[in-house]
Amino acid sequence: MSPSPSPFTISVSDEALDSLQNKLSAATFPDELEAPNQWQYGAPLADVKRLATRWQDGYDWRGAEAKLNELPNFMTQVEVDGFRPIDIHFVHQKSEAERAIPLLFVHGWPGSFIEVTKLLPLLKSGSPAFHVVAPSLPNFGFSSGIKEPGFSLQHYAEACHKLMKQLGYDEYVTQGGDWGFYVTRAIGIQYPDSCKASHVNLIRAHAPEWKKNPLLALQHKLFPYSDAEKNGLERSAWFENEGSGYNLQQRTKPQTIGYALADSPVALLAWIYEKLHDWTDSYPWTDDEILTWISIYWFSAAGPAASVRIYYEAIHVSPKATVIPTRVRTEQWVPDVKLGLAWFPKELSVPPKTWGRTLGPVVYESETPRGGHFAAWENPDVIAGDLQKMFSKTGPCYRIVKGRSGYDRGARARL
């Protein structure tokens, strides 16, 4: 008998809250240099102290928890080949349109399912409308952790695909950024009969090659980069040279950094806060927004250290991987899934347009003058607008999901 989803309520124990308060009260902070720009060295001491103080005294997790519980949260179990059953937490917002388009939204690190929340009201009743499924990936949020080694991109993709199948969505479309880019690309490689189209806001691609993409290679050779593309290459170079140290640590020795993330809320705060600042386009974070994002990691079912293991497993190919959609493979041509690209100037990887078009049959592109890495949070109107244009009656992906145009109105559907 296959498992069925059940409603889920986020409920952090009083003991966990007390433990957080005790750890914050006992925190030891480092000194810092007398530098004019503290951000060059990492998260500034004054900012981290302010946030830690707010987290200990003034921040209302119970209020944030209640807000998260207003979402249609569910829990189910999926089985991934070679691993023990996994408890998957997910948000499942169903539109009133009976034939709404099933959309799988996949988050990354240091994001979570919370990133979908601003999209939900825009996609529920739009034209077209979407049934939105936003899981906490295994090792993230309120999904369970993976205890065995070798849980690679193939297995993250399998978990998400099996969730969609369990919900009755034999065909669906996807949206993702950060690890959501890689996971949804892996889904397109593994399950092209089910994944009909993808929209991504992280664009990890390489220059077109004559043998693989002759027309794109010719365009790349003949036409100079635009000013926006030159700025994008500068942004990409900045990230590689000045912003990617976390990546090297997490993809080589995730366990080592895990001790700090699991034991010290201040370490977790500084580690993530730096990214929220550096990876956005001057987004006006409130302190409570930041603390809610970080609290989801601190109170996560598997613990904050588990989330960084995806970096290691994605590049160390496991004997359990049979399809092998590695990071390298996901950055190459995927033939069977129509693709939409959203370009933002402060994304971490901003390659020239011809590079992005090497990823697959690109049928839709948008370019926004402002925005960064967390597009669904910074620019929800852009992401929702892209999806509605891409799948509209005049869009390139109209009726791409069999029997689900997104337009007809029916009785309120039930899970």
Task: Please report, for each region that a protein language model flagged, where it lies by residue.
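Conserved hydrolase catalytic core segment
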Residues: 122-129, 167-229
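Short beta-strand element of the alpha/beta-hydrolase
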Residues: 100-108
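Alpha/beta-hydrolase
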Residues: 3-18, 28, 196-296
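C-terminal subdomain of alpha/beta-hydrolase-fold enzymes, centered on the catalytic histidine
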Residues: 250-415
